[in-house]
Amino acid sequence: MATRRRTLLKVIVLGDSGVGKTSLMNQYVHKKFSMQYKATIGADFVTKELQIGEKLVTLQIWDTAGQERFQSLGAAFYRGADCCALVYDVNVLRSFDNLETWHEEFLKQASPSDPKTFPFIVLGNKIDVDGGSSRVVSDKKAADWCASNGNIPYFETSAKDDFNVDEAFLTIAKTALANEHEQDIYFQGIPDAVTENEPKGGGCAC
Protein backbone atom coordinates (compact mmCIF):
# COMPACT_ATOMS: atom_id res chain seq x y z
CA MET A 1 0.00 0.00 0.00
CA ALA A 2 1.40 3.40 -0.96
CA THR A 3 2.60 5.71 1.80
CA ARG A 4 0.77 9.03 1.96
CA ARG A 5 2.97 11.95 1.01
CA ARG A 6 3.63 14.44 3.76
CA THR A 7 3.45 18.02 2.53
CA LEU A 8 5.83 20.61 3.97
CA LEU A 9 4.53 24.17 3.87
CA LYS A 10 6.73 27.14 4.68
CA VAL A 11 5.03 30.11 6.34
CA ILE A 12 6.76 33.40 7.14
CA VAL A 13 5.45 35.56 10.00
CA LEU A 14 6.33 39.26 9.67
CA GLY A 15 5.62 42.43 11.61
CA ASP A 16 7.17 45.02 13.90
CA SER A 17 9.00 43.98 17.06
CA GLY A 18 6.68 43.46 20.02
CA VAL A 19 3.46 42.77 18.10
CA GLY A 20 3.34 39.19 19.41
CA LYS A 21 4.63 37.08 16.52
CA THR A 22 6.52 34.64 18.75
CA SER A 23 3.66 34.52 21.27
CA LEU A 24 1.16 33.59 18.55
CA MET A 25 3.42 30.81 17.31
CA ASN A 26 4.06 29.45 20.81
CA GLN A 27 0.35 29.51 21.60
CA TYR A 28 -0.49 27.69 18.38
CA VAL A 29 2.24 25.03 18.54
CA HIS A 30 2.87 24.60 22.29
CA LYS A 31 -0.29 26.10 23.86
CA LYS A 32 1.92 28.30 26.03
CA PHE A 33 1.97 32.04 26.68
CA SER A 34 4.53 34.14 28.55
CA MET A 35 4.19 37.77 29.64
CA GLN A 36 7.97 38.17 29.40
CA TYR A 37 9.09 39.78 26.17
CA LYS A 38 12.20 38.41 24.50
CA ALA A 39 13.18 39.82 21.12
CA THR A 40 13.78 37.32 18.34
CA ILE A 41 17.32 37.55 17.00
CA GLY A 42 17.63 36.77 13.31
CA ALA A 43 15.11 34.03 12.54
CA ASP A 44 13.81 30.81 14.05
CA PHE A 45 11.04 28.36 13.21
CA VAL A 46 8.61 25.92 14.79
CA THR A 47 6.70 23.07 13.17
CA LYS A 48 3.24 21.62 13.60
CA GLU A 49 1.54 18.72 11.87
CA LEU A 50 -2.12 18.83 10.95
CA GLN A 51 -4.58 17.00 8.75
CA ILE A 52 -6.30 18.95 5.98
CA GLY A 53 -8.77 16.76 4.17
CA GLU A 54 -6.85 13.70 2.95
CA LYS A 55 -3.50 15.41 3.28
CA LEU A 56 -1.01 15.28 6.16
CA VAL A 57 0.61 18.69 6.37
CA THR A 58 3.67 19.91 8.26
CA LEU A 59 3.62 23.66 8.79
CA GLN A 60 7.09 25.16 9.10
CA ILE A 61 6.43 28.57 10.64
CA TRP A 62 9.28 31.06 10.48
CA ASP A 63 9.55 33.80 13.09
CA THR A 64 11.70 36.67 11.85
CA ALA A 65 13.01 39.61 13.84
CA GLY A 66 11.12 42.85 13.42
CA GLN A 67 14.20 45.02 13.82
CA GLU A 68 15.27 46.82 10.67
CA ARG A 69 18.88 45.71 11.03
CA PHE A 70 17.78 42.11 10.49
CA GLN A 71 15.73 42.75 7.37
CA SER A 72 18.80 41.97 5.27
CA LEU A 73 18.35 38.33 6.34
CA GLY A 74 15.14 38.32 4.34
CA ALA A 75 16.07 36.83 0.99
CA ALA A 76 17.46 33.60 2.45
CA PHE A 77 14.52 33.05 4.77
CA TYR A 78 11.64 34.32 2.64
CA ARG A 79 12.31 32.36 -0.55
CA GLY A 80 10.34 29.18 -0.96
CA ALA A 81 7.53 30.46 1.27
CA ASP A 82 4.00 29.22 0.57
CA CYS A 83 2.24 31.94 2.60
CA CYS A 84 3.11 35.07 4.57
CA ALA A 85 1.35 36.20 7.76
CA LEU A 86 1.54 39.94 8.51
CA VAL A 87 1.03 40.73 12.20
CA TYR A 88 0.33 44.06 13.88
CA ASP A 89 -0.73 45.21 17.36
CA VAL A 90 -4.24 46.71 17.35
CA ASN A 91 -3.06 49.07 20.13
CA VAL A 92 -0.08 50.48 18.20
CA LEU A 93 -0.90 52.48 15.07
CA ARG A 94 2.68 52.45 13.80
CA SER A 95 2.69 48.64 13.66
CA PHE A 96 -0.40 48.77 11.44
CA ASP A 97 0.99 51.53 9.22
CA ASN A 98 4.11 49.42 8.72
CA LEU A 99 2.14 46.51 7.22
CA GLU A 100 2.61 48.11 3.82
CA THR A 101 6.38 48.11 4.30
CA TRP A 102 6.44 44.47 5.42
CA HIS A 103 4.18 43.50 2.51
CA GLU A 104 6.49 45.17 0.00
CA GLU A 105 9.62 43.87 1.72
CA PHE A 106 8.39 40.28 1.51
CA LEU A 107 7.52 40.50 -2.19
CA LYS A 108 10.88 42.11 -2.92
CA GLN A 109 12.92 39.51 -0.99
CA ALA A 110 10.87 36.38 -1.73
CA SER A 111 10.43 37.11 -5.45
CA PRO A 112 7.32 34.88 -5.88
CA SER A 113 6.47 33.87 -9.45
CA ASP A 114 3.22 35.88 -9.32
CA PRO A 115 3.36 38.66 -6.68
CA LYS A 116 -0.26 39.68 -7.31
CA THR A 117 -1.67 36.29 -6.32
CA PHE A 118 0.82 35.24 -3.64
CA PRO A 119 -1.17 34.44 -0.46
CA PHE A 120 -0.96 36.71 2.57
CA ILE A 121 -2.97 36.75 5.78
CA VAL A 122 -3.23 39.63 8.28
CA LEU A 123 -3.48 39.15 12.05
CA GLY A 124 -4.50 42.03 14.32
CA ASN A 125 -3.08 40.82 17.64
CA LYS A 126 -3.40 41.81 21.33
CA ILE A 127 -7.12 42.54 21.27
CA ASP A 128 -7.17 41.52 24.96
CA VAL A 129 -5.11 44.51 26.19
CA ASP A 130 -7.05 46.68 28.68
CA GLY A 131 -10.25 44.95 27.65
CA GLY A 132 -10.02 46.60 24.25
CA SER A 133 -9.97 50.17 25.59
CA SER A 134 -6.40 50.80 24.36
CA ARG A 135 -7.25 49.90 20.80
CA VAL A 136 -6.34 52.44 18.11
CA VAL A 137 -6.81 50.41 14.90
CA SER A 138 -10.44 49.57 14.15
CA ASP A 139 -11.42 46.30 12.51
CA LYS A 140 -12.91 48.34 9.64
CA LYS A 141 -9.61 50.11 9.00
CA ALA A 142 -7.79 46.77 8.92
CA ALA A 143 -10.45 45.16 6.73
CA ASP A 144 -10.27 48.09 4.28
CA TRP A 145 -6.48 47.72 4.02
CA CYS A 146 -6.83 43.99 3.37
CA ALA A 147 -9.51 44.59 0.73
CA SER A 148 -7.34 47.13 -1.08
CA ASN A 149 -4.43 44.68 -1.16
CA GLY A 150 -6.13 41.79 -2.91
CA ASN A 151 -8.77 40.76 -0.35
CA ILE A 152 -6.27 39.37 2.16
CA PRO A 153 -7.94 37.21 4.86
CA TYR A 154 -8.02 39.04 8.21
CA PHE A 155 -8.22 37.74 11.79
CA GLU A 156 -8.23 39.52 15.13
CA THR A 157 -6.29 37.48 17.66
CA SER A 158 -5.10 37.26 21.24
CA ALA A 159 -2.10 35.04 21.91
CA LYS A 160 -2.67 35.55 25.64
CA ASP A 161 -6.31 34.38 25.61
CA ASP A 162 -5.79 31.92 22.74
CA PHE A 163 -8.51 33.70 20.77
CA ASN A 164 -8.73 32.92 17.04
CA VAL A 165 -5.16 31.55 17.02
CA ASP A 166 -6.03 28.04 15.80
CA GLU A 167 -8.54 29.42 13.31
CA ALA A 168 -6.00 31.87 11.88
CA PHE A 169 -3.27 29.26 11.44
CA LEU A 170 -5.70 26.76 9.92
CA THR A 171 -6.57 29.38 7.30
CA ILE A 172 -2.85 29.99 6.80
CA ALA A 173 -2.30 26.24 6.26
CA LYS A 174 -5.20 25.92 3.81
CA THR A 175 -4.09 29.03 1.92
CA ALA A 176 -0.51 27.80 1.75
CA LEU A 177 -1.66 24.36 0.59
CA ALA A 178 -3.76 25.89 -2.18
CA ASN A 179 -0.81 28.00 -3.28
CA GLU A 180 1.51 24.98 -3.32
CA HIS A 181 -1.00 23.07 -5.46
CA GLU A 182 -1.22 25.95 -7.94
CA GLN A 183 2.58 26.13 -8.10
CA ASP A 184 2.74 22.39 -8.87
CA ILE A 185 0.31 22.81 -11.77
CA TYR A 186 2.18 25.90 -12.98
CA PHE A 187 5.57 24.20 -13.05
CA GLN A 188 4.21 21.02 -14.63
CA GLY A 189 2.89 23.16 -17.46
CA ILE A 190 6.25 24.83 -18.21
CA PRO A 191 8.98 22.18 -18.01
CA ASP A 192 11.45 24.40 -19.87
CA ALA A 193 11.05 27.39 -17.53
CA VAL A 194 14.37 26.80 -15.77
CA THR A 195 16.43 26.84 -18.93
CA GLU A 196 14.56 29.88 -20.26
CA ASN A 197 15.41 31.86 -17.13
CA GLU A 198 19.05 30.75 -17.06
CA PRO A 199 21.29 33.80 -16.53
CA LYS A 200 23.59 34.70 -19.43
CA GLY A 201 26.87 32.88 -19.19
CA GLY A 202 25.37 30.60 -16.56
CA GLY A 203 25.88 27.41 -18.51
CA CYS A 204 24.47 25.44 -21.37
CA ALA A 205 20.69 25.29 -21.82
CA CYS A 206 20.85 22.29 -24.15
From Swiss-Prot:
Membrane topology: Lipid-anchor
Binding site for GTP: 15-22, 63-67, 125-128, 158-159
Cysteine methyl ester PTM positions: 206
Lipid linkage positions (S-geranylgeranyl cysteine): 204, 206
Cellular location(s): Cell membrane
GO biological process: protein transport
Record bears the keyword Nucleotide-binding: yes
Pfam family, one: Ras
Cell wall biogenesis/degradation recorded as keyword: no
PROSITE patterns listed in its UniProt record: RAB (PS51419)
Gene Ontology molecular function: GTP binding; GTPase activity
Keyword entries, A-Z: Cell membrane, GTP-binding, Lipoprotein, Membrane, Methylation, Nucleotide-binding, Prenylation, Protein transport, Transport
Placement of sequence motif Effector region: 37-45
Gene Ontology CC annotations of this record: plasma membrane
Family per record: Belongs to the small GTPase superfamily. Rab family.
Protein task: Intracellular vesicle trafficking and protein transport.
Protein name: Ras-related protein RABG3a
Highest classification ranks of the organism: Eukaryota, Viridiplantae, Streptophyta, Embryophyta, Tracheophyta
